[in-house]
């Protein structure tokens, strides 16, 4: 099928001007995820904040009740017993100076990064590498911790980090098209709840302004914000 015809087909039945209840929006997106691979279901939340101001930054981490469907590679900066704990918990890459050297050389073989507090002076050297990728360990979201086993299991088990972008948007994957619709709805509501709880002191007016759901290759469907709470 030609790309133009394919796009026309998957867009049929979606009113671009309408705000759909969350459960209906998810159903529409799932029905149109027709690629040969299991598409990721993504959510975009527009917030009434200006992240250029420190008191309007929004970030956090949420454990999705039904996981993400992704295989997440976890890297841990730790030594001694904590390194052993990380390996036992299923971390894919564990190290100290050796791991720093790997990352500096451009070998980043992980998707999420965790560090013990004593490692941060060393890990701090990697700010220019990990920072732009949103992978720098941060105590505010539980990735600088002595509980490395818990952090590794959380990252592997469906925890999602979120951070508002320059345009005031949070984007996150919340599951796969193969998930049951009700499980995707539960995940989206869990994300929205976490975003609400992370509302900064400097936010004024309507906080969650717009919500949209889409699949990797599909069109976005606008959601009535009141139905995600």
From Swiss-Prot:
Alphabetical GO biological process terms: regulation of translation; translation
Pfam families, sorted: Ribosomal_L1
Q: Look up the record and report any one GO term of the cellular component aspect.
A: cytosolic large ribosomal subunit
Q: Which GO terms describe its molecular function?
A: rRNA binding; structural constituent of ribosome; tRNA binding
Against SUPFAM superfamilies, the record matches this protein to: Ribosomal protein L1
Kindly state which keywords UniProt assigns to this record, in alphabetical order: Repressor, Ribonucleoprotein, Ribosomal protein, RNA-binding, rRNA-binding, Translation regulation, tRNA-binding
Question: InterPro entries, alphabetically?
Answer: Ribosom_uL1_bac-type (IPR005878), Ribosomal_uL1 (IPR002143), Ribosomal_uL1-like (IPR023674), Ribosomal_uL1/biogenesis (IPR028364), Ribosomal_uL1_3-a/b-sand (IPR016095), Ribosomal_uL1_CS (IPR023673)
**Would the keyword tRNA-binding be found if you checked this record's keyword annotation?**
yes
Q: Which PROSITE patterns match?
A: RIBOSOMAL_L1
Its subunit composition reads: Part of the 50S ribosomal subunit.
Q: What does this protein do?
A: Binds directly to 23S rRNA. The L1 stalk is quite mobile in the ribosome, and is involved in E site tRNA release.
Family, as annotated: Belongs to the universal ribosomal protein uL1 family.
Protein name per UniProt: Large ribosomal subunit protein uL1
- The species is Rhodopseudomonas palustris (strain ATCC BAA-98 / CGA009)
Q: Lineage, please? A: Bacteria, Pseudomonadati, Pseudomonadota, Alphaproteobacteria, Hyphomicrobiales
Gene that this sequence comes from: rplA
């Amino acid at each position: 099928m030609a790309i133009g015809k394919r796009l026309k087909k998957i867009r049929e039945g979606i009113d671009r001007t309408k705000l759909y209840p969350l459960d209906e929006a998810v159903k529409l997106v799932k029905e149109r995820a027709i690629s040969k691979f299991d598409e990721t279901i993504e959510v975009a939340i527009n917030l009434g904040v200006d992240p250029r101001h420190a008191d309007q930054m929004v970030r956090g981490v949420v454990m999705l009740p039904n996981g993400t469907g992704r295989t997440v590679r976890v890297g841990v900066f730790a030594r001694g017993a904590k390194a052993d704990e990380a390996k036992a918990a299923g971390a894919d890459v564990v190290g100290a100076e050796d791991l720093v050297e790997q990352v500096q050389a451009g070998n980043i073989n992980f998707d999420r990064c965790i560090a013990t507090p004593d490692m941060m002076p060393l890990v701090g050297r990697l700010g220019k590498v990990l920072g732009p990728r949103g992978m720098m360990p941060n105590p505010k979201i539980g990735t600088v911790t002595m509980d490395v086993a818990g952090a590794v299991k959380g990252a592997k088990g469906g925890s999602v980090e979120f951070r508002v972008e320059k345009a005031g948007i949070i984007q996150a994957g919340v599951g796969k098209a193969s998930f049951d619709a009700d499980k995707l709805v539960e995940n989206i509501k869990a994300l929205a709840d976490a975003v609400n709880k992370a509302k900064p002191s400097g936010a004024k007016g309507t906080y969650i302004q717009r919500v949209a759901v889409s699949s990797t290759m599909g069109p976005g469907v606008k959601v009535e914000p009141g139905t995600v709470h």
